[in-house]
């Protein structure tokens, strides 16, 4: 794994529509399938595709982990409807680093990012999420780009 570059940035509030997933984080694809079906049915266009993680897998049993398959949407579409929940990711200070390559390598990039944060003296708190910067339907796995965000104190 190449070295991780951590940026500290201020992130604006994000309005999201989401589908909750309970269970191992690597199984969130089921929630994304529901999310994509709902968005297609409702004709809602996503501004960004996200996966939001609520629990620390080192502290919570895999079967109880909470995550959301989510999309950032305009204020006009920020309503709970059908199987979608309206939520917000609060504005704040975040550490951000980039993963390039197949999603199967994300776990190693998360771990390397947390090690780099520790070396920089950054303390994680609150929400963390992934933002998928390109479309896996028309991007080779080696070229996929994912931004990882961890709220910091």
Predicted features along the sequence, with ranges:
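A solvent-exposed interaction/effector surface
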Residues: 1-153
């Amino acid at each position: 794994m190449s070295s991780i570059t951590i940026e500290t940035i201020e992130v604006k509030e994000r309005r999201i529509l989401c589908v909750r997933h309970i269970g191992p984080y690597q199984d969130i694809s089921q929630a994304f399938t529901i999310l994509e079906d709902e968005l297609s049915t409702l004709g809602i266009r996503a501004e960004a595709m996200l996966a939001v993680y609520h629990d620390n897998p080192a502290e919570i049993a895999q079967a109880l982990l909470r995550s959301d398959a989510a999309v950032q949407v305009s204020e006009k579409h920020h309503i709970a409807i059908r199987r979608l929940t309206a939520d917000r990711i609060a504005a704040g200070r975040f550490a951000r680093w980039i993963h390039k390559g197949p999603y199967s390598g994300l776990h190693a990039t998360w771990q390397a990012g947390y090690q780099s944060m520790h070396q920089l003296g950054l303390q994680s708190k609150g929400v963390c999420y992934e933002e998928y910067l390109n479309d896996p339907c028309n991007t080779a796995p080696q070229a996929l780009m994912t931004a990882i965000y961890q709220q910091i104190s």
